[in-house]
Amino acid sequence: MPETRTPGATQAFPSESTTLLADVRRFVAAGSAPYLAQPSVHDLVLAVTEACANAIRHSGSDEIRVTVAIDGPCVEITVEDDGIYRMSLPVMDGDPGSNRGLYLMAAMVDDFSLHRGTAARAGTTVRLLKCAS
């Protein structure tokens, strides 16, 4: 039987919300739990949380859009903003824990991509794919 892709559910989150990350975690966990084992849900939620934290910190966008879609045995998450992507310095403000988010996201999922907008068409899209084992 061929694998099928289920259209995703998208939710917009105001970037100034004090509960944004908790709201995103609940949204992603609810959308992925029927398809993935709990450890995989946890990994995916961690990666999405990092993507959203990066969007809040670096994009200047008023909102962040998160989509949860099912692609065969996999859950695909996209995190989109309307800001301008800025590459950070290797270590920001002397914080050795800073600037590891992209590596963390890639380590937590089966496939990871980042599409940067341009000056003419702003916006960054992070795509995260986690598949059932």
Language-model segment annotations:
Residues 1-17, 107-133:
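Flexible, glycine-/charge-rich segments associated with ATP-binding catalytic modules
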Residues 62-69:
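A conserved short beta-strand within the histidine kinase catalytic ATPase domain
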Residues 55-59:
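Short helix-loop "hinge" at the ATP-lid/N-box region of the Bergerat-fold HATPase_c
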Residues 22-49:
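Conserved short strand/loop->alpha-helix "switch" segment adjacent to the catalytic nucleotide/phosphoryl-transfer site
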Residues 76-102:
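Glycine-rich/acidic phosphate-handling loop/turn and adjacent ATP-lid/helix
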Residues 71-74, 119-120:
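Short strand-connecting beta-turns/loops that link adjacent beta-strands
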Residues 2-5, 29, 60:
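Two-component transmitter module helix at the DHp-CA junction of histidine kinases
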Residues 67, 74-78, 127:
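Short, highly conserved beta-strand within the GHKL-type HATPase_c fold
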